[in-house]
Amino acid sequence: MPHETLLDNQGWFKKLARRFGPGHVVNTCFLIVMLFSTLLTWREVMILKDAYVASQRNHLGSVANVLDRQLQFNMDRLIFLRNGMHEALVAPLAFSALQSAVTQFEQRRVRHFWQLELDKRRTLPLYGVSDQFVARTTLLSRESRDLANELTATLELGYLARLARSSAMLALETMYVSRSGFYLSTLPTAYGSDIVSRYYQYVTQPWFIEQSQRRNSQRGVRWFTSAQPYVTDEQKKVTASLPLDHDNYWYGVLAMDIPVASLQRFLRDAAEKDIEGEYQLYDNHLRLLTDSAPEQQTANTLNDRERALLAREIEKDTLGGLRLGTHYVSWERLDHFDGILLRVHTLREGIQGNFGSISIALTLLWGLFTAMLLISWGVIRHMVKNMFVLQNSLQWQAWHDPLTRLYNRGALFEKASRLAKRYREARQPFSVIQLDLDYFKSVNDRFGHQAGDRVLSHAAGLIGSTIRAHDIAGRVGGEEFCIVLPGATKAQALQIAERIRQRINDKEILVTKSTTLRISASMGISSAEEYGDYDFEQLQSLADKRLYYAKQSGRNRICASDATQEREKK
């Protein structure tokens, strides 16, 4: 087994080359190529994703604009009615019919229910309840000094409300409910106790109660959703309400009821050309009002977790998008409705669409390129590995003796010279052993060269297993070996040589099927500490000279000094 001492002062490039062989270089190159191809593909995916998000927002924005314009049309009518009534409060008309209506009110105000009507063809009737009913709660009051003006303004509102009705409006009912115990509505009420129940229903609704000056300090339009559990889908509605104030006094509320069914029809019409995605309208509490899904199809509703995630995102911006499982949800707040419009796009719709086709093609291209890259990497890696193995084999053959598997003469001298130089600079001991097998020629002559080869291989194995890990050994001649002992003093070298001599002498070798042979070795030792000379060739020559003395003294001996001072060891 060959021993090799690694030099600490090798160049950084050689160390790097030793650490990173051709296989590592191939792996690194292919890894860089795959990384860049993946990054480029990922960049394309991000661009495609941004385009997809922009497409979703554009689809949602077009439908939201149509719905918002329609709601704005209705809100403009409501504000127009409020402004007209406010003008009537400030400057009431001095028509005799209006004055007569005030007189009739004074006569009927104590009744349980009553009705005032000026002209059935041009105005809407006014319905009211008694003073006793109004006095039951602090929310209602007939103590206003402008009660007569409010009454005439409400009658004038009847003209405007009748004229303002249009088939293009989403609203089913427009009404004014006064805190003074009367109301006006575009939907007629049968004369009787229904007037009381209807007025009671109005003044107990959130859209009326929440318009007090304390609860609505901005005095703007507010939206409310009917959330009663017993209300059917056909009866669901949203209500827009607007307070009527003058001189810091709250007179009442103008309101407009819009059926959810009307919103659904309008939403389906607006999204008719958009064959992908589903539109959903939610109120400000994220309660689903309606959707654009066909009647035979179930809507993609949000669960509680998805609703919470969406609510958190809505707090940050007025529009955006969010991936929820296999759905992509884009949302936008409406300008004229206190709620949001959602567009839900499923994974199946995305795959079947244009962006899905592009994504699939991009994925297939990346997969094909990656597969080709991996196959090429495997082929080149295999070729480089074979070349590297061949190179190492040739290099090993160039440095080692094929029979003994120790260093050959050239490699040994090169490595030993570098070691000697290093230990000379460090001023550390350095020793050399020269070894020769005794009577080796007779082994070849008696048993043949194959037996001789077996003896050489056997001796080399014993040498390699006896020396230290950082020592090196090589075959420098026919049956002659050289052992380099860096860091070993002459005494230590003598101990190592003695162990080698004993092991070689103690082991028998099977040279033929029925014949064993015991061999011996003679050795000469030299050390740099003797003369301070670290020149390896000089040390090897001196050890070889002492080897000759050992042989002259009878073989199977070690000579560690000149012939006049040598000590024999058997």
UniProtKB/Swiss-Prot annotation:
The chain crosses the membrane at residues 20-40, 360-380. Substrate binds at residues 444, 449, 453. Keywords: Cell inner membrane, Cell membrane, Cellulose biosynthesis, GTP-binding, Magnesium, Membrane, Metal-binding, Nucleotide-binding, Transferase, Transmembrane, Transmembrane helix. Disulfide bonds: none annotated. One of its GO terms (cellular component) is plasma membrane. The active site is at residue 479. This is Probable diguanylate cyclase DgcQ. It comes from Salmonella typhimurium (strain LT2 / SGSC1412 / ATCC 700720). The gene is dgcQ.
